[in-house]
Design a protein with these regions (language model features):
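Membrane-anchoring hydrophobic helices of lipid-metabolizing enzymes
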Residues: 2-96
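Non-catalytic C-terminal accessory region of glycerolipid acyltransferases
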Residues: 2-15, 148-275
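Catalytic core of membrane glycerolipid acyltransferases/transacylases, capturing the structured
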Residues: 44-68, 76-77, 92-146
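Short, conserved catalytic or adaptor-binding loops enriched in Gly and charged residues
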Residues: 73-75, 134-135, 217-220
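Short gly/ser/thr-rich secondary-structure transition/capping motifs
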Residues: 77-85, 144-148, 208-211
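Short glycine/serine/threonine/alanine-rich loop segments
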Residues: 80, 141, 194
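Alpha-helical membrane-embedding segments
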Residues: 85-101, 131, 154-156, 221-223, ...
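Structural alpha-helical scaffold elements that stabilize or flank donor/cofactor-binding regions
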Residues: 90, 135-136, 157, 188
Length: 275
């Protein structure tokens, strides 16, 4: 080990940096909780008072603004470094499915912070959460508890001109570089006849990944980078397309920064074909 790291003069710096990391961790959690709870409280009366043609645009604008402010605050205090500018080119591209990989809980926050007309399929426990539920309902986000209803609502949102955020893995990544992909993305795109825009989220940290304790301090700053992948036409055969999409993600992310533990399972080497 480098002797300089063990020298007495380095100890104060290391302790100060550790204290800063704890401050940044708690600041981020409290700030996100405050933003979410404030908007959720305001969303309840708005949901019942305003007509739906107003509530959905208002709800999505507010969530985009809140998430963008939150990420800006994390950047300002030096906790994270975000490169999300690639998403800006999608804003005026019309209805499509935006399909990123899913390394951590901040993935949806990052995407929605840049795309204000985004519908989102959410887990039931998030929609029912006191911090997020009312705001999610105001924005017209879709519950994933009943698959047939979920697919119908997703297709309807796309037909109304919304963009739709779906994580093809269905949950946060536990197999390097991506989990097995689910068929929902291809099925919805096929029925709505919209393209699928792949998005790659790269990070150097396992923070808020699957199994990461909420209050565990990560090394900071954390880097997040988003880049756009290929945009695919609506698939004709959902099953075959899903397998090809998974191989495409594997090939594109194989050399990305490795954030999973060394003993995490690995996807088999492959070369995407037929896309």
């Amino acid at each position: 080990m480098n002797a300089a790291l063990l020298s007495p003069s380095s100890l104060p710096r290391r302790w100060l940096h550790r204290l800063y990391e704890y401050f940044a961790l708690w600041f981020g959690l409290v700030l996100l909780g405050a933003i979410s709870l404030t908007w959720s409280t305001l969303s309840v009366p708005l949901y019942y008072v305003l007509p739906k043609r107003w509530t959905v645009p208002l709800g999505r604008w507010a969530i985009t603004t809140g998430f963008r402010s939150y990420l800006g605050a994390l950047s300002l205090i030096g906790a994270c470094r975000f490169d999300l500018s690639a998403l800006d080119s999608l804003r005026d591209d019309g209805p499509m499915i935006v399909a990123p990989n899913h390394p951590c809980l901040l993935d949806a926050v990052m995407v929605i912070s840049r795309l204000p007309n985004m519908a989102c399929i959410m887990k039931v426990d998030i929609v029912d959460n006191v911090f997020l539920g009312a705001g999610a309902r105001l924005a017209g986000y879709i519950r994933n508890d009943a698959q047939l209803s979920m697919i119908k609502q997703a297709v309807a949102e796309l037909n109304r001109g919304s963009q739709l955020l779906i994580f093809p893995e269905g949950t946060r990544t536990t197999r390097w570089p991506v989990n097995v992909c689910k068929g929902t993305t291809a099925l919805i795109a096929s029925r709505a006849r919209v393209p699928i825009q792949t998005v790659f989220i790269e990070t150097d940290s396992a923070y808020l990944g699957k199994g990461w304790p909420l209050f565990r301090r990560p090394p900071m700053p954390i880097t997040y980078r988003v880049r756009l992948g290929r945009r695919f036409d609506p698939p004709e055969r959902a099953g075959t397309f899903t397998e090809d999409l998974e191989r495409y993600f594997i090939d594109e992310l194989r050399d990305a920064p490795h954030f999973l533990p060394p003993d995490a399972p690995q996807a088999a080497e492959s070369r995407a074909v037929g896309l």
